[in-house]
Amino acid sequence: AQDTAAVEQAMRRTGTLDWANRDVRALSGGERQRVYLAMALAQGGTTILLDEPGAFLDVRAQFELLDLLRSVAAGGKAVVLVMHELPQAMQYADRIALLGGGRLLGCDTSTALAATGAVDRVFGVRLCRAPDGVWYVKAEG
């Protein structure tokens, strides 16, 4: 009964409860991503590791997922994401590990990492922050 309750709660959090009786193979890629997150939440571990969690999701669903992961982290779980959407990572992550050329180039808060200029050098873009705090990139040149 406790396992069933954990699964139901995880499915409610991820908006997947209506799909409980559907074959996972019949789900879209984005729907599967949400089901996999529900599975991770239901297991009750202390850490969630996700590789490109926004893949296959439309823009709105990507931000809804990031908001959900933020609340999961606020609840005490460690949430580790591998992602290539730089502005989203800068906006949502408490800490960022910047990789380039197979090496760790820096690991810090968004603000501290941006101040080093490493992000700009690695990606050949200029990392900027709007007055409202939202991060964005400008292509150089």
Each language-model region and where it sits:
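A short, surface-exposed alpha-helical micro-motif characterized by mixed small hydrophobic
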Residues: 89-91
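Conserved ABC ATPase signature
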Residues: 23-27
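Catalytic Walker B motif of ABC-type/P-loop ATPase nucleotide-binding domains
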Residues: 48-52
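Conserved ABC ATPase "signature" region
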Residues: 2-19
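H-loop/switch region of ABC-family ATPase nucleotide-binding domains
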Residues: 83-84
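ABC ATPase nucleotide-binding domains
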Residues: 121-141
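H-loop (His-switch) and adjacent beta-strand-loop-beta switch element
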Residues: 96-109
